[in-house]
Amino acid sequence: MIFMTNEIVNSTSTSQKLILASQSPRRRELLAQLGYQFSVQASDIDETVEKAETAYDYVLRLAKQKAQHVLDLLPEAERVYSYVLGSDTSVVFNGEILGKPDNEENCIDTLSLLSGNQHQVLTAIALVSHAGVKGQVITTEVTFKTLTKAEISAYWLTGEPQDKAGSYGIQGIAGQFVKTINGSYSAVVGLPLYETAQLLANAGFVGSIHTK
């Protein structure tokens, strides 16, 4: 589907096509916030962490693979003018990648680790095209207040943490858990606005405001 925010949004060339390789409504909203015209195509890849893989390497690999997967699905003639943006986010505590919770117990365990502590959120972006791959990783430090088990259980019942890396969504109810954040808020949500705008500008795309 095509997602547009207004009529003036366009690319510098009508031959260029931007595709977001994600089914995340949060990433779609963030990219639209920058004023780009783009289509959305979900990417289905294996997200298993490889042996001895660091969180940095993991998120960057997934961002690239998501974008490459979508590019490979396109008819060969379309690949010449298509640019696919992939992104991946992981919550990391003491070097351990904290995935999405399978159940309430898993959520309680994860948020108990984060309670009263600082953790890192790593978000990678990658732009894949016929010209190659460009990507980077943004690291943000987040500190939580101390949480009670009752608070965590109540949070689980809201349904918000059930599809979130690290068992929380900073843009929602869990925003009240955050004491401090050092880095990019939008990266924690799922797509770093500044870095994404820079990446797309360098590829020749123009949003609401041309970024240099």
UniProtKB/Swiss-Prot annotation:
Entry similarity comment: Belongs to the Maf family. YhdE subfamily.
Matching Gene3D superfamilies: 3.90.950.10
EC number in record: 3.6.1.9
Compartment(s) of residence: Cytoplasm
Any one cellular-component term (Gene Ontology): cytoplasm
Catalytic activity: dTTP + H2O = dTMP + diphosphate + H(+); UTP + H2O = UMP + diphosphate + H(+)
Function according to Swiss-Prot or TrEMBL: Nucleoside triphosphate pyrophosphatase that hydrolyzes dTTP and UTP. May have a dual role in cell division arrest and in preventing the incorporation of modified nucleotides into cellular nucleic acids.
Active site: 88
Root EC class: hydrolase
InterPro entries hit by this protein: ITPase-like_fam, Maf-like
GO MF entries: dTTP diphosphatase activity; UTP diphosphatase activity
HAMAP family recorded: Maf (MF_00528)
An annotated GO BP: nucleotide metabolic process
Protein's name according to its UniProt entry: dTTP/UTP pyrophosphatase
Keywords, alphabetical: Cytoplasm, Hydrolase, Nucleotide metabolism
Cofactor(s) listed: a divalent metal cation
Residues flagged as site, Important for substrate specificity: 26, 89, 171
One Pfam match: Maf
Listed NCBIfam families: maf
